[in-house]
């Protein structure tokens, strides 16, 4: 090592000047006095604590969690009002029965599409027109919104019975998004 760079050079002087020398006779008595005057027992607080706001906070958190779980279950099991308006309900309401007797010829009447379109709601009409135009059902491409957690960036929209000027304005405004 280079001269004058010993890390222990000045340490000895500090210990010599600051350390107190004790007599060997009093050492045991001094240590006993030191440990008898121990204040560690006063550091522990054995008194009963008041529950206070922590209980109220816990109850608030529990109530919030319960409400969230109930909301989740309601969202899971409650039918949306649109489910009762489906194609099956409106088409099955008009069931065609053909009476047949023994030996008679069974004939099933072919109901034209125009009769179905006239008899049922506009929604069924629009869904049927979509299926005829695209060879796939609108409900196969889409689903009812249930939660934000399962969102997709792909959008499917069906427009029917809109004015030509509205259609042109939608085409120009949605061109950047499609």
UniProtKB/Swiss-Prot annotation:
Its main location: host cell. The keyword Repressor does not apply. Keywords: ATP-binding, DNA replication, DNA-binding, Early protein, Helicase, Host nucleus, Hydrolase, Isomerase, Nucleotide-binding. Gene3D superfamilies: 3.40.1310.10. The keyword Hydrolase applies. GO terms for molecular function: ATP binding; ATP hydrolysis activity; DNA binding; helicase activity. It catalyses: Couples ATP hydrolysis with the unwinding of duplex DNA by translocating in the 3'-5' direction; ATP + H2O = ADP + phosphate + H(+). It is found in: Host nucleus. Its EC number is 5.6.2.4. GO terms for cellular component: host cell nucleus. One of its GO terms (biological process) is DNA replication. It holds the Pfam family PPV_E1_DBD. InterPro entries: PPV_DNA_helicase_E1_N, PPV_E1_DBD, PPV_E1_DBD_sf. SUPFAM superfamilies: Origin of replication-binding domain, RBD-like (SSF55464). Belongs to the papillomaviridae E1 protein family. ATP-dependent DNA 3'-5' helicase required for initiation of viral DNA replication. It forms a complex with the viral E2 protein. The E1-E2 complex binds to the replication origin which contains binding sites for both proteins. During the initial step, a dimer of E1 interacts with a dimer of protein E2 leading to a complex that binds the viral origin of replication with high specificity. Then, a second dimer of E1 displaces the E2 dimer in an ATP-dependent manner to form the E1 tetramer. This is Replication protein E1.
């Amino acid at each position: 090592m280079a001269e004058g760079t010993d890390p222990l050079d000045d340490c000895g002087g500090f210990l010599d000047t600051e350390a107190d020398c004790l007599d060997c006779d009093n050492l045991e008595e001094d240590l006993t006095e030191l440990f008898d005057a121990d204040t560690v027992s006063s550091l522990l607080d054995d008194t009963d604590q008041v529950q206070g706001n922590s209980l109220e906070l816990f109850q608030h958190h529990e109530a919030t969690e319960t409400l969230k779980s109930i909301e989740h279950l309601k969202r899971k099991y409650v039918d949306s009002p649109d489910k009762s308006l489906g194609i099956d309900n409106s088409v099955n309401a008009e069931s065609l029965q053909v009476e047949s007797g023994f030996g008679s010829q069974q004939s099933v009447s072919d109901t034209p599409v125009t009769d179905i379109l006239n008899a049922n709601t506009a929604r069924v009409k629009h869904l049927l027109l979509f299926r005829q135009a695209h060879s796939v059902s609108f409900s196969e491409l889409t689903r009812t919104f249930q939660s934000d957690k399962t969102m997709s960036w792909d959008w499917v929209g069906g427009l029917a019975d809109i004015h030509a000027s509205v259609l042109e304005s939608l085409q120009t405004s949605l061109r950047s998004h499609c």
